[in-house]
């Protein structure tokens, strides 16, 4: 009798596990389908001498070139620039090398990326624009302004991955590489981690202390979860993420003193990528640059994003009158 009861209990446990697994997989298929549909619309491909470049344009008014960070694509750029669109700017957001529909060429260095940004400006008949580089998009943003200064009206660096003395040999923690290697190859594993290991993803991929998330206003927590969710499908961004990871561990010092354009750099002191020190060093070596730093917020500037957007919009308005570029196609 006892054996029979044990078998029945075991069978019930197995059945519950199967049903639970089917429900989980059903939810995954629904959500990954929605994310794939999201990135499948709203962008175009510009065929340029630098290769095909995916991009999207949103809003009206003065144009701004938005260069996304790691784990991104044109969609991340649009999300980052949503406040700019709301404030009357026209945002051009591309997918950098290895992200979504922009292929990874043999030379995917920040220098080659900077030249590709110029190719996109040419394709869209844009002359001189403000450049916004976020996170791992900062190196190519700086190099765009250094290599092609005639195309850059102003520069904004948001939580920039950049050089600072003593950081050249610094490697990300082992947990970072474990999470990257585990999740990059599988949309399902990343999706699962986003449900059951959010704290780990916040600390590694999003470089934001979990306490900053817990202490942020509701709308900021919703923004953070949206950013985490919209890294899916991560498999469509894998090549770009690996390229950014390689670049980020050995960024050289650029000739910052040669930059002669209005510049603002924004970061948070507890950004786990260390962008506060990097950003402050960068601003200190660009003539007239302004550094805006927050004590908390992490890499996502949680709790300070609205303030940062006000700073950003004000800065861009101040430089708006410097040029009247052509409209993007």
Report each predicted region and the residues it spans.
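An N-terminal hydrophobic leader/cap segment in hydrolases
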Residues: 8-45
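Conserved HGGG/HGGXW glycine-rich cap/lid loop of the alpha/beta-hydrolase fold
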Residues: 57-101
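Conserved acidic catalytic loop of the alpha/beta-hydrolase fold
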Residues: 112-129
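Conserved hydrolase catalytic core segment
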Residues: 129-169
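Alpha/beta-hydrolase
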Residues: 175, 184-254
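Short beta-strand/loop motif that positions the catalytic acidic residue
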Residues: 259, 265-267
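Conserved alpha/beta-hydrolase "acid-adjacent" motif
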Residues: 272-278
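Catalytic histidine-centered segment of alpha/beta-hydrolase-like enzymes
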Residues: 291, 297-309
């Amino acid at each position: 009798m006892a054996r029979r009861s044990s078998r029945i209990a075991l069978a019930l446990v197995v059945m519950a596990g199967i049903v639970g697994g089917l429900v989980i997989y059903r939810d995954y298929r629904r959500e990954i389908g929605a994310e794939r549909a999201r990135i499948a619309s709203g962008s175009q491909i510009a065929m340029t001498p630098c290769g095909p470049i995916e991009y999207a344009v949103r809003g009206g008014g003065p144009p701004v070139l938005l260069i996304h960070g790691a784990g991104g694509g044109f969609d991340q750029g649009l999300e980052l620039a949503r406040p700019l669109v709301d404030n009357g700017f026209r945002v051009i957001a591309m997918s950098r090398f290895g992200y979504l529909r922009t292929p990874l060429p043999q030379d995917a260095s920040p220098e080659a990326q900077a030249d590709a940004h110029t190719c996109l400006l040419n394709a869209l008949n844009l002359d001189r624009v403000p450049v916004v580089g976020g996170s791992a998009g900062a190196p190519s943003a700086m190099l765009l302004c250094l290599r092609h200064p005639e195309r850059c009206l102003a520069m904004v660096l948001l939580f920039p991955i950049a050089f600072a003395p003593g950081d050249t040999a610094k490697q990300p923690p082992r947990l970072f590489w474990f999470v990257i290697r585990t999740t990059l190859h599988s949309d399902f594993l990343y999706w699962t981690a986003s449900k059951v290991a959010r704290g780990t993803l916040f600390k590694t991929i999003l470089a934001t202390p979990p306490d900053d998330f817990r202490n942020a206003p509701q709308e900021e927590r919703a923004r953070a979860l949206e950013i985490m969710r919209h890294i899916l499908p991560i498999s469509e961004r894998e090549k770009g993420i690996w390229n950014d990871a390689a670049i980020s561990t050995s960024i050289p010092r650029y000739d910052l003193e040669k930059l002669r354009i209005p510049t603002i750099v924004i970061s948070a002191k507890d950004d786990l990528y260390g962008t506060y020190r990097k950003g402050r060093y960068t601003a200190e070596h660009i003539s007239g640059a302004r550094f805006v730093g927050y004590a908390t917020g992490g890499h996502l500037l949680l709790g300070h994003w609205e303030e940062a957007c006000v700073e950003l919009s004000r800065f861009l308005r101040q430089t708006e009158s410097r040029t009247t570029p052509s409209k993007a196609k």
